[in-house]
């Protein structure tokens, strides 16, 4: 049986659980949407049934794998023999672990063999890995006949163990290893987290556990485990003669830190336990990790011990957020205490370039999007020169979130996306916005003409691919493909509007109404309109050759004359003029391809259709990103001006699918007519399943 890495992980998790688990929990575990989980569950159900297992669904409780223990064990055994398909990130981490562990260069083919991929895949992974390690001051030597070797200072290697490996550790896995060790059931030679031996790691854990009473403060579970891994790796490196260096003035500063005495206590115990000599610089290194660790109790931060600058910055941040969300939090001392307990070690982490991992980051960004954006702006303003990661900001959001009355519903942003036709570039832009800002709750699409009839006050933001000629409409204009600069502009736009958005949501105190049974006649008519447009598109889809000459204006006329022969438009000249006007508003070429998407909604169009044409003469056209490209294939998507909302959704699903991935763009660019028809068929099938129509 073939299973993707995600399906294997999902199935294994279900088999090992003895409790009901919700789809939301699974989505957070897998770091995907709940929709993806539902799709994966459909794939693994048949495999479970082969050994007599079923998925029991209980409303309000979740899912549970039900069946005999023998059936579960059989499937787990099969999974262990299944060829493992590593994700790209997993491969990069495994390569990094191999390079950290090896004192000698590692051959490319050895890595490819171990990861069960091609040499070319490993080469690409190494290119990406170089980007990962560069900020740490590490480089890769890659020479034919020599192999691959990780080069850089010992301090940097220690740091990368924390930032790229420890931050991805599984606390549950660590605790299970400790439990097995207590029961004498662990293999001490096995590697944990790819870089440290399990035996040494568990020995280190016992030592630190015994030292807990002597250490002046309590670490959170994640910080405690991270310290265990850091110190185990440090001891292994010291045994190999690899020690870190530290400037004398930095060391002297650390000696004055309140954590230094605890670091000395730990170092002395490690010298006795492992038979090594720990230099002063290594004691300084331990001090840094203690300073950067999150504490279990906020009361461990005494007012007289807190850096004055950090205290002032924290108070200013609270005042800024209070003003932003129109709620006074400046007198909430519990919030101040909790923030200080997080921010003091956070500032140390940032100064030392030590990252922290927040497994709830994506959910926090979704649930408290506006608060997250406000805090992101606040730390940038009041902690200048310090780069707070998304993980750090998400932790700060939790502190504010617990002190606020901001409900998750208040933080949800609803956007209206506008383009000239409402069926082409608006859906492309919405797709890109979902990728860049998945926290935006929902998107509606509109053409410029439809915008006049929209209640724009029902939306928190309006994003357009074309200038909006109407007065009193606040909007931001970006490219349909939303480059990095555009994405940043949208984020800044949201930050400016946070007070207005929250005020509007709070002022409209409409009570939630019970969901009524829908009008089934209306629902059936709506489904009929969806089906009608799908039929029109599939029945009239073709990939044809179009003989053209170098005159671009003639190209449009020839195109529309062909469409008139097919019975799809009325007046070719009028339609050509309308499309030429549309082209003046912004390029239609799809960047990175040789295609352009010609989309138009106009009364000259008889019915909705999607056609493609290969050109005998390439043309230079403006792309959606403002650059020119050589067009050899035209994608034509058109509809009558009276197209229903359901029809617009169907055509938008196509334009979204075109740019969904590199594979999708390549397919639309290179495939033949029959393959493209099947691709459209799959697009509609997937869309209907997601709409729960099938």
Swiss-Prot record:
Catalytic reaction equation(s): D-mannitol(out) + N(pros)-phospho-L-histidyl-[protein] = D-mannitol 1-phosphate(in) + L-histidyl-[protein]
E.C. code: 2.7.1.197
Modified residues annotated as Phosphohistidine in this record: 230, 289, 342, 399, 599
Domain PRD: from-to ranges: 195-300, 305-410
Induction conditions: Up-regulated by mannitol or glucitol.
Key words, A-Z: Activator, DNA-binding, Kinase, Phosphoprotein, Repeat, Transcription, Transcription regulation, Transferase
One MF term in the entry's GO annotations: DNA binding
List of residues that carry Phosphocysteine: 419
InterPro entries noted in UniProt: BglG_antiterminators, HTH_11, Mga_HTH, PRD, PRD_sf, PTrfase/Anion_transptr, PTS_EIIA_type-2_dom, PTS_EIIB-like_sf
Pfam families xrefs: HTH_11 (PF08279), Mga (PF05043), PRD (PF00874), PTS_EIIA_2 (PF00359), PTS_IIB (PF02302)
Superkingdom field: Bacteria
Regulation of catalytic or functional activity: The regulatory activity of MtlR is modulated by phosphorylation and dephosphorylation of the various MtlR domains. It becomes activated via phosphoryl group transfer from PEP, EI and HPr on the two conserved histidine residues in the PRD 2 domain, whereas phosphorylation of the EIIA-like domain on His-599 by the PTS EIIB-Mtl domain of MtlA inactivates MtlR.
Record PROSITE patterns: PRD_2, PTS_EIIA_TYPE_2, PTS_EIIB_TYPE_2
GO biological process, one term: phosphoenolpyruvate-dependent sugar phosphotransferase system
Record domain PTS EIIB type-2: where: 413-502
UniProt keyword Cell membrane present: no
Family the entry assigns: Belongs to the transcriptional antiterminator BglG family.
Name of the protein in question: Transcriptional regulator MtlR
Record organism: Bacillus subtilis (strain 168)
């Amino acid at each position: 049986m073939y299973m993707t890495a995600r399906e294997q992980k999902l199935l294994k998790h279900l088999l090992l659980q003895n409790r009901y688990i919700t789809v939301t929990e699974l989505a957070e575990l897998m770091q995907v949407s709940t929709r993806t989980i539902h799709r994966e569950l459909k794939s693994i159900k048949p495999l479970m049934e082969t050994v007599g297992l079923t998925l029991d669904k209980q409303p309000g409780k979740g899912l549970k794998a039900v069946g005999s223990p023998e059936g579960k064990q059989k499937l787990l055994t099969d999974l262990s023999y299944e060829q493992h398909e590593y994700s790209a990130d997993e491969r990069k981490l495994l390569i990094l672990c191999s390079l950290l562990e090896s004192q000698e260069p590692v051959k490319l083919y050895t890595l490819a063999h171990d990861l069960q991929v091609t040499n070319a895949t490993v080469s690409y992974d190494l290119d990406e890995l170089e980007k990962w390690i560069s900020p740490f001051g590490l480089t890769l030597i890659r020479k034919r006949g020599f192999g691959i070797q990780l080069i850089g200072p010992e301090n940097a290697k220690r740091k990368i163990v924390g930032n790229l490996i420890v931050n991805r550790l599984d606390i549950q896995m660590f605790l299970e290893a400790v439990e097995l060790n207590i029961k004498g059931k662990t293999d001490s030679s096995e590697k944990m987290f790819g870089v440290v031996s399990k035996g040494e790691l568990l020995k280190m854990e016992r030592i630190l556990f015994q030292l807990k009473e002597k250490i002046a403060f309590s670490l959170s579970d994640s910080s405690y485990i991270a310290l265990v891994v850091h110190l185990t790796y440090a001891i292994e490196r010291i045994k190999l003669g690899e020690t870190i260096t530290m400037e004398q003035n930095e060391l002297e500063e650390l000696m004055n830190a309140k954590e230094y005495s605890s670091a000395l206590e730990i170092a002395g115990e490690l010298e006795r336990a492992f038979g090594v000599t720990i230099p002063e610089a290594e004691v300084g290194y331990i001090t840094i990790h203690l300073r950067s660790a999150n504490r279990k109790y906020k009361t461990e931060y005494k007012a007289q011990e807190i850096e004055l600058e950090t205290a002032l910055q924290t108070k200013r941040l609270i005042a800024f957020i209070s003003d932003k969300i129109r709620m006074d939090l400046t007198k909430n001392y519990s919030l101040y205490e909790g923030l200080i307990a997080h921010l003091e070690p956070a500032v140390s982490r940032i100064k030392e370039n030590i990252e922290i991992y927040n497994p709830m980051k994506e959910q926090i960004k979704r649930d408290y999007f506006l608060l997250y954006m406000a805090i992101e702006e606040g730390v940038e303003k009041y902690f200048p020169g310090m780069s707070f990661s998304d993980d750090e900001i998400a932790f700060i959001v939790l502190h504010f979130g617990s002190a606020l009355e901001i409900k998750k519903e208040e933080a949800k942003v609803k956007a209206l996306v506008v383009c000239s036709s409402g069926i082409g570039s608006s859906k492309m832009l919405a797709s890109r916005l979902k990728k860049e800002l998945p926290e935006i709750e929902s998107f509606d699409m509109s053409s410029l003409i439809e915008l006049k009839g929209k209640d724009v006050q029902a939306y928190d933001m309006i994003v357009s691919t074309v200038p909006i000629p109407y007065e009193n409409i606040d909007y931001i204009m970006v490219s349909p493909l939303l480059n990095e600069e555009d994405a940043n502009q949208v984020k800044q736009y949201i930050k400016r509007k946070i007070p207005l958005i929250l005020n509007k949501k709070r002022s409209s105190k409409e009570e939630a109404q019970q969901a009524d049974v829908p009008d089934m006649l209306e629902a059936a008519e709506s489904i009929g309109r969806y089906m009608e447009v799908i039929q029109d598109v599939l029945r009239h889809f073709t990939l044809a050759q179009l003989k053209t000459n170098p005159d671009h204006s003639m190209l449009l006329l020839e195109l529309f004359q062909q469409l008139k022969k097919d019975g799809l438009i009325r007046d070719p000249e009028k339609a050509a003029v309308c499309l030429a006007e549309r082209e003046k508003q912004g390029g239609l070429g799809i960047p990175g391809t040789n295609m352009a998407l010609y989309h138009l909604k106009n009364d000259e169009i008889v019915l909705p259709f999607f056609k493609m044409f290969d050109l005998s003469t390439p043309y230079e056209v403006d792309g959606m990103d403002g650059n020119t490209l050589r067009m050899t294939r035209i994608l034509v998507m058109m509809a009558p001006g009276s197209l229903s909302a359901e029809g617009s959704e169907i055509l938008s699903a196509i334009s979204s699918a075109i740019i969904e991935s590199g594979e999708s763009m390549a397919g639309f660019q290179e495939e033949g007519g029959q393959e493209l028809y099947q691709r459209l068929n799959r697009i509609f099938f997937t869309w209907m399943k997601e709409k729960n129509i099938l």
